[in-house]
Amino acid sequence: MDKKLIIIDGNSIINRAFYALPDMNNKDGLKTNAIYGFTTMLFKIIDIYKPTHISVAFDRKAPTFRHLEFEEYKAGRKKMPDELRVQFEPLKNLLDKFNINRIEIDGYEADDIIGTVSRVAEEDGFKVFIVTGDKDAIQLASNNITTLITKKGVADVEEYNYDSVLEKYEMTPTQFIDLKGLMGDKSDNIPGVPGIGEKTGIKLIKEFSSVEGIIENIDSLKGSIKKKIEENKELALMSKKIATIIRNVPIEFNLKDLEYGNYDKNSVIEEFKKLGFTSLMSRLIDLDGDSNQNKIKLDFNISKLDNINEFIENVNKKKELILKIVKKEGNILEKNIMYVFLSLDGKNIYYIDESDVTNLKDVFSSNEIKKFGYNLKDDYIALRPYGIKLENLNFDISIAEYLIDSTSTTSYECSDIAMKYLALKIKSREELLGKGVKAKKYNELDFKELSEHISNTINLVKEVRPYMEESLNDMEMKSLFYDVEMPLVEVLGFMEFEGIKVDKYKLSELGIEFKEMIVKLEEDIFEMSGEKFNINSPKQLGNILFEKLKLPIIKKTKTGYSTNAEVLDKLREKHPIIDKISEYRQIVKLNSTYVEGLLNIINPISGRIHSSFNQTITTTGRISSTEPNLQNIPVKLEIGRNIRKVFIADNDCDLVDADYSQVELRVLAQMSQDKNMIDAFVHNEDIHTKTATQVFNVTSNEVTPELRSAAKAVNFGIVYGKSDFGLSEELHIPLKEAKAYIENYFNKYSKIKEFMEKTIEDACINGYVKTMFNRRRYIPELKSNNFMLRNAGKRAAMNAPIQGSAADIIKIAMVNVYKKLEEKNLKSKLILQVHDELIVETVKEELELVKSIVREEMENAVSIDVKLDVDLNVGKSWYETK
């Protein structure tokens, strides 16, 4: 095998990577963009050139002989940004994990180390590849040494060997030093000969071979060139000397020490995890191929479960079961199971088809047997049509990973988890099925391919669970995981399967009403504008508003004028057409999203909507929902509230709606321990009225609805980390006035200010914030050198503990209400959660008991100084409960 050496100019490449890539941080807030860029370049170079040996040369801070020769050498260079400086040691540490040789020496630059090592390697029969962003290294090119100059950041390189230098510059690589001597180098502050550029320099060197040759033949020169050389010949010689790379640096090294490939892959993986380089793990595997001795493989056997009784006996002994259900697409209420894959040890994996599902009913529904898996909510729902309730959902790796890192850019798929924990490449769902209209369904897959994919999942659960448990324990989130998040999986599965009834007739009526309103608004808008146009076209609307009606231009886009909601809000006072356009947009959205949208997803069997509840989407811990997104039904306008009329109770039932009152402010009072705010809640004062008296210096009798509304905006603005500018925009008041509001607020609620400041301070140190229940949210933006991102990070740091704690409380309440309804064997069902609100579809004869249970469990979900308060209402529709 040919001996190939890659030698990298460490300072040059990390510097280029830093400026080429956007700001990046790991979970601890360490800047990582330069390390990431360097590593991707390293992988690319290894992949293309297949080196047997690698070394990285770094500059040292100590002055070199060049500084002694010329004091102004590299003078005027910008100071290295701190954001780059802090990345050098972590990069060197990563190179050590790769067992990649590093060389640095006082008095010499990386260029000189590269020059020396490349010479020694060439003499030893190596093919050498120098990677740098500095064209000075072109002088080192030869038949066996190729200089790779990076371009476009670090993404691409340009190759220079002896022949290509000769072709491009019409000179030899060593003559490139003479060119530098003549034309200088601004980046290194090498003066050269003033007035001599690249074109003239090349011409002179072609004629006289070198700087010395030009000086010896100075009389042959003419005009201004002769004068320039004559006046600056010492400068030219000195510039050449400084530009010359030393090739005999006194360093002791053995080429054997530069061998690449003998490294502990697991150590590299751990370092990637610390740096947050999950995406590079798959490239690490591709880099090494199957030959890497450290490669981890999932190990399993797949077979059909023939002896069900023996399996039941074994699972009852072990009290643990890993499972994954594969189902075909179909109605949520119908039997759609194709296969159930089962394992006791993660290695021996069995499967049954639909015909045997009910034979394992006792295993599935046993509360004594812990169930482990991935996306267990889907498994719970799949079994419900068979009259089976999957009990004791103990460990779901997607939920665990979400708790460990709620800000992950991955979707918590098995493929992402396998890569992170095992550096193992398994197919993602998209890779297995494809995407878009050409995507396959599970029942269209070859059984071998399907079974291997599902078995990978089961084996993965077994392999990563211990690591995840250790992380949850270290992060003090075991209780949150086992007592809240895992019981919640069943609750959400239950709610999803049960759904909420929809009055289809009422919904159609609402659609007719909306369409009539849309037509009327169109007529009004056309009349006000004096012509018909496409209101939904930002371009046409912009032309009407800003060219025809001459309204002030607030913001421009690449294609014209911005007409977004923020712009329209600023134009409200300028023309009556603005309110009409805003109303038109609201009704069009309501009609398309909640009338046409809901009509399309009403289940034909149940007449209900079965929304999907998502547990691993938001960074704060809140539950979200899709198809439809019930969290986003507008409630501020009556027209939006009307949507709630279509959500109704089943026959002989009522909806019991229980909504936490100001839960986030109560959490804020608890976490800050602000006596003023705690007292207000303890004495059942209206907190917004209380805040109005504190902020506006008025008595409670003097608090008008407008002042209370402003105080409410201040209260929640503080919770969401709103700035004085944001508050001024919301309340349409001067910036100075908004600033005074916030200052008054913090003067009266001083402990809240202390709490906010301490939260940000701790977040900057730790890289994350925590809720009352130890849920973490990492905030790398706090370490950003971008002012806007940093401020956004501060707002997130202030808000996440409050909103996250409120989310934890509603989850605890959901679990407790669900359990209590089950314990009492009630027919009433918890069917919906929206923000701080729970809805129970209640059988009439159980109404009083359900009201009592819901209030009791919600108000006592957690024990805190500030009592939780619940607004509880009953109605036939969701609308009637408000």
Give short role names for the model-derived ranges:
Residues 440-443, 497, 610, 616-618, ...:
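Conserved catalytic core of nucleic-acid polymerases
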Residues 5-6, 10, 16-55, 71-72, ...:
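Conserved RNase H-like, two-metal-ion catalytic cores of nucleic-acid enzymes
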Residues 519-523, 527-579, 747-795, 799, ...:
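C-terminal polymerase-core module
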Residues 341-346, 406-407, 412-435, 453-460, ...:
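Function-dense linear segments that define catalytic or interfacial modules
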Residues 2-131, 135-159, 235-238, 244-252, ...:
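Noncatalytic, basic helical substrate-engagement surface that gates or grips nucleic-acid strands
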Residues 2, 51-55, 89, 98-100, ...:
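Non-catalytic nucleic-acid-binding/docking modules located in mid-to-C-terminal regions
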Residues 155-156, 162-180, 297, 335-472, ...:
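Active-site-proximal helix-loop-helix substrate-binding element of RNase H-like nuclease domains
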Residues 232-355, 437-638, 654, 664, ...:
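Conserved "right-hand" nucleotidyltransferase catalytic core of DNA-directed polymerases
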